[in-house]
């Protein structure tokens, strides 16, 4: 089989038709799955010896949240090392990273696998993976044809990463540094709330404004602070962390501003405070609402004038520090109650950010669950950790009052429980492995029984027609995948579809 000009043109058109990088990537993957008639396809970005999924088709949704470290996935490592098309034989002993992650085929292992490394110049920037359940599924495509596909994908990914790099550095195209993948803290989530938060982080990171990050406990406020710092001009300098809630009143001032020898009992030497440590960098003050009013006044002075005084010292030190503060309280209410200074609140909240709770993030819970499953797999040396359909359903309907932190702990506990009840190094998480309070799941949809107005032959054909339509919709009109889903021969399916008027 060879690709026609029309097929390649269609792929190129789909890449241009999308609105934004994510949409283009998804169109590419969906189109490739249809053209190649494979069971699953994925576009991965390479960063720091791991592959990060950008778009998937035919795979469980939690794959988008997983981070595939090369040392834990020998097939992906082989793709990263190769400079060309990689075809894995059906009897390869190397485990496939997507085993158990193809919906409807969880109990089966991938038999056909092709990896296409993607390059920008000499730099590896990503990979395309194509998977099928039939051993010889991709034999009809030559390496040259697959290289054409890889070239189109590499061009799209390279352009997206270059634009991202230029935007993060606030550079014009003519001023671009040599290409390299942009490294930043991974913030997992595609929900509208997280998409908006990421945009706001990109905007404020390039400035030097103070930022107030608000959100419930466990939502990931520290991760937001790291993302801001890493995307800012101060990224080459330290990010210093201080939990204000853990500061005893007796040492809080010393922790913030430092002290000199003899300033108080136990001060046996000079000591720098967090502001000095963060000079030319960023200071993250977690739980800022827990600071006493006296310390709030001293913090305000630093923000106003940029100088500090060590405890016991009359001299002032100039510091250049960007302050990121976080709180799980409503500081406006705290100001009205007299527990937080209004002037400090306004100094800190020049650019406020709000981190949405997990219950408002929709399918992000599944992406995050995939991320934590992969972490557990590596930590415990397992070959795979996957979520059953029942577990996914439970996670999507639980409220998560403890937010992302609660989800992380729940996944870790479930993996340990599932591992204890199953021999081998493969773990499938079921709903019973999660110790959540009672969750009311939506009842399964029951189709209404229609009044019979057809003879048996007409009713049978109507049922067959609707079943094929649904299977085609679920498989993006991929006839080969549809045939496998319906457990019939693809040639017989084509003949039946023609008889039923579904094909010309």
From Swiss-Prot:
Residues 187-416 form the Sigma-54 factor interaction domain. The keyword Transport does not apply. SMART domains: AAA, GAF. Signal peptide: none annotated. It holds the Pfam family GAF. HAMAP family: NorR. PANTHER family: ANAEROBIC NITRIC OXIDE REDUCTASE TRANSCRIPTION REGULATOR NORR, TRANSCRIPTIONAL REGULATORY PROTEIN. Required for the expression of anaerobic nitric oxide (NO) reductase, acts as a transcriptional activator for at least the norVW operon. Activation also requires sigma-54. This is Anaerobic nitric oxide reductase transcription regulator NorR.
């Amino acid at each position: 089989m060879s690709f026609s000009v029309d097929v390649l043109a269609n792929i190129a058109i789909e890449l241009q038709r999308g609105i934004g990088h994510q949409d283009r990537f998804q169109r590419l993957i969906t189109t490739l799955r249809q053209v190649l008639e494979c069971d699953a396809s994925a576009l991965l970005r390479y960063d720091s010896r791991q592959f990060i999924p950008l778009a998937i088709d035919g795979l469980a949704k939690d794959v988008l949240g997983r981070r595939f470290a090369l040392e834990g996935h020998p097939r992906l490592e082989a793709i990263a090392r190769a400079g060309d098309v990689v075809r894995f034989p059906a009897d390869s002993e190397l485990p496939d990273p997507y085993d158990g992650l193809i919906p409807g085929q969880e109990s089966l292992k991938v038999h056909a696998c092709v990896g296409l490394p993607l390059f920008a110049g000499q730099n590896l920037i990503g990979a395309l993976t194509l998977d099928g359940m039939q051993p010889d599924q991709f034999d009809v495509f030559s390496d040259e044809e697959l290289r054409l596909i890889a070239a189109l994908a590499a061009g799209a990914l390279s352009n997206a990463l270059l634009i991202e790099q230029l935007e993060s550095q606030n550079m014009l195209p003519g001023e671009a540094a040599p290409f390299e993948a942009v490294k930043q803290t991974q913030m997992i989530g595609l929900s509208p709330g997280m998409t908006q938060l990421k945009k706001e982080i990109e905007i404020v990171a390039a400035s030097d404004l103070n930022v107030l990050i608000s959100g419930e406990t466990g939502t990931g406020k520290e991760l937001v602070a790291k993302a801001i710092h890493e995307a800012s001009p101060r990224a080459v300098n330290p990010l210093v962390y201080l939990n204000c809630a853990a500061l005893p009143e007796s040492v809080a001032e010393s922790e913030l501003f430092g002290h000199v020898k003899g300033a108080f009992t136990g001060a046996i030497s000079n000591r720098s405070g967090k502001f000095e440590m963060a000079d030319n960098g960023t200071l993250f003050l977690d739980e800022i609402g827990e600071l006493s009013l006296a310390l709030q006044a001293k913090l305000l002075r630093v923000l106003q004038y940029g100088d500090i005084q060590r405890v016991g010292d009359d001299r002032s030190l100039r510091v250049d520090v960007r302050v990121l503060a976080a709180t799980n309280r409503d500081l406006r209410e705290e100001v009205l109650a007299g527990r937080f200074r209004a002037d400090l609140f306004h100094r800190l909240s020049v650019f406020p950010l709000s981190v949405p709770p997990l219950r408002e993030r929709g399918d992000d819970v599944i992406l995050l669950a995939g991320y934590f499953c992969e972490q557990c797999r590596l930590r415990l040396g397992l070959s795979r950790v996957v979520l059953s359909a029942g577990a996914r359903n439970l996670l999507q309907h639980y409220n998560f009052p403890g937010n992302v932190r609660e989800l992380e702990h729940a996944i870790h506990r479930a993996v340990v429980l599932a591992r204890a009840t199953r021999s081998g190094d493969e773990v499938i998480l079921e709903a019973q492995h999660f110790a959540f309070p009672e969750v009311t799941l939506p009842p399964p949809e029951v189709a209404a029984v229609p009044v019979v107005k057809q003879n048996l032959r007409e009713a049978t054909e109507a049922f067959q027609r609707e079943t094929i339509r649904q299977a085609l919709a679920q498989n993006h009109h991929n006839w080969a995948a549809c045939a496998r889903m319906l457990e019939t021969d693809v040639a017989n399916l084509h003949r039946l579809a023609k008889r039923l008027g579904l094909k010309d």
